[in-house]
């Protein structure tokens, strides 16, 4: 059943607030499948949250009072998700689980932007809106305030709101991690960045590189505020069996530790 041409549909009885659905080419009611389908420039709106795409499907359940409660929204092609904290573009398919306040987005060029922070994926992005957590899987890339770029197979963002601004509280990287700053490149299996300390801890197969010189070990701490990096034996390795080592090119290594590395090894 086609409800209307270029009209809107207002939800019903939803615990997260009313949901309005708009479409240029009409809204269809598929009663047997308990869903509405919005076609052409479709948009679902709830408070500050909006989902836009070429096609939107809204699935609902009826309660004891025969009121309709939308439980899931699916968006297909040219997906854009936006609220006051962030904007997600580049999705080709998205699912929004309303009760969980959770997004699952597929696409080859997904970008989440929050203030000056950017998170990208060429495969999928998951976003827990109420928990302020985003996970990018694929060739994931994160940029923070133009301070550094981190690449990994999987990146986990923890966001926080402070002084009416949204910032990155913590960042985790898994598999094939690389961090690029203006002065150096660091590689590892895993990484944890803490915004409070501005220190990034690297774990497993660590390599700190500047030019043709690099340091190798199992654990490192990169201080993005001071520009000093520490290459250390792996935490908990009391016997220090995994020694750190440096490979230096013909030009030598810069001994100004404010610009280069503080090397700690016993």
Where are these regions (language model features)?
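N-terminal amphipathic/hydrophobic interface segments
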Residues: 1-266
